[in-house]
Amino acid sequence: MKRIKNVLIFFLAMVMLGACRDKKSEKKEEENIQQENTFVNPLKTEGAQCWANYYDGWYYYMQEAVDRLELWRTRDITDLEHAEHKVIWIPKDPSNAHHLWGPEIHPIAGKWYVYYAASDDNMDNHQLFVLENSSADPFEGEFELKGRISTDKNNNWAIHPNVFEH
């Protein structure tokens, strides 16, 4: 009985000793490990699924947004964080007004086109869409929805558009 009592006291002492550890240094250690294993984009600290295009002395940049499309431009890509930017499209049609992903801007035949994926708020219904701006400068004029891009007869899930000239 005395042996069980001693083992129990020893066990309780170990539990109490473990509870006295320095949680601040443990948290700091975890943060250091995360910082060592995390890449921070030096050009822009926030933004997913980004796209950059260099045209006529300007860098044009787009990134994912939940409910709108924004465009940045700068002559110095290393100063993207401070670049001029504007909202170029806010969808009004509920079929393409949610989860705007992977926008890309392309100058083609004197016009500007933005390709992106969006849904009707059901993640299974992502489709591709295209906007057009007839202005030579994408910061001038207005982007107009040209429509959904049909990728197949079953309207399967479609994301991450890209175009090329042939």
Question: Predicted segments — roles?
Answer:
Residues 20-166:
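Carbohydrate-active catalytic/glycan-binding domains of CAZyme proteins
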Residues 1-29:
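Bacterial Sec-dependent N-terminal signal peptides
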